[in-house]
Every structure is written in structure tokens, then in C-alpha cells.
Amino acid sequence: MGCSGCSGGCGSSCGGCGSRCGGCSSSCCVPVCCCKPVCCCVPACSCSSCGKGGCGSSCGGSKGGCGSCGGSKGGCGSCGGCGSSCCKPVCCCVPACSCSSCGKGGCGSCGGSKGGCGSCGGSKGGCGSCGGCGSGCGSSCCVPVCCCVPACSCSSCGKGGCGSCGCSQSSCCVPVCCQRKI
């Protein structure tokens, strides 16, 4: 089903998901594992289920209190986008590129907070395990935002080994022993 004709003001702005779009539900366009949804208040599926034969029964749908779909929520603006054939949350701050880009010429503006995620800590937006870059990451390593509470301050990172310490830098939680230069 195409994305056109959605109710609730979505209309032609639904994002061109084409045949992979899940249609409309509760006045909101509900993509199912299609890239770049515009008018969906919630992610189509969690990133942990991307590219693994479907998103499961909990995918899609709309969540109460979204209000007008397609905009920003929580001050994250246009964070999200497409990765691994999975619709990442539109309004959750996530890295702009994958960890596969780490240490390969730099990630540019990857990582960091895009509009503010609030306080870091816990798991948000399908971070799963924190980091994911492996050991020995350089300063341009892509890391998730708002995932993992640091165990100690930045002042102790990279000084004689991280030990069990994490590192908080620019409101972004860095995984343990990422060896980011301070």
C-alpha cells in the first residue's frame, strides 16, 4: 500500500515508502520496515529486529500523545533516518552513521546529540548494548547517544587505562575503554 491518502494531515508528505508502506492507522502513516517515514509517531520496529525476516507483531502502530505526526518530539529535530533497512526512530537522537564507519576516515558529524536527548543513561531508541564499536576506537568513532551511564568522569578517561570507567563527553555517553582522546 502506498503512503498517499493518509488521514490526519499526512497526505502527500508521507515520505514515498511505496509498496513497503504499511498504510495508515490512527490518523498516522505506519511504515513497516521502510526507509524514512515522515508521518509516523513511533518507529516501525526496533533496530534489533532489522533485516531479520520481519519486525514482529509489535511493529508499526501509533502511540498515544504523539500529536501531529511528522514533526519533532523531544527536541531531536530530524534525528533518525534509515539504516540496515530499518526505520529508526525519527525523534530519537542516534548516530548518523553506523559503527562500521569507525576508524575509516572519520564519521564527520556522527554521534553526539542532535537537538538534545535529555539526560543520558539507560537504554533509549534501541541502543541495546552500548557502543558496538569494539576496542581501540579512535576519536572519530561513532557511538550511540543516550545509552550507558558513565561510571566516572571524563577527567579519568584515557589516563592509564579506562578500567571500568566510562566517559561523558559533550552530553554523549562514550562506551567503556573507547580510548577517545580527551
UniProtKB/Swiss-Prot annotation:
Domain of life where this protein originates: Eukaryota
Biological process (GO), any one: defense response
Keyword Protein biosynthesis: no
A single Gene Ontology CC term: extracellular region
Tissue: Cuticle layers of differentiating wool follicles.
InterPro entries: Alpha-defensin_C
Keyword annotations: Keratin, Repeat
Record text about domains: Mainly composed of Cys-rich (CR), Gly-rich (GR) and Ser-rich (SR) repeats.
Function, in words: The keratin products of mammalian epidermal derivatives such as wool and hair consist of microfibrils embedded in a rigid matrix of other proteins. The matrix proteins include the high-sulfur and high-tyrosine keratins, having molecular weights of 6-20 kDa, whereas the microfibrils contain the larger, low-sulfur keratins (40-56 kDa).
Record-stated family: Belongs to the KRTAP type 5 family.
Protein name, as recorded: Keratin, ultra high-sulfur matrix protein
Record organism: Ovis aries
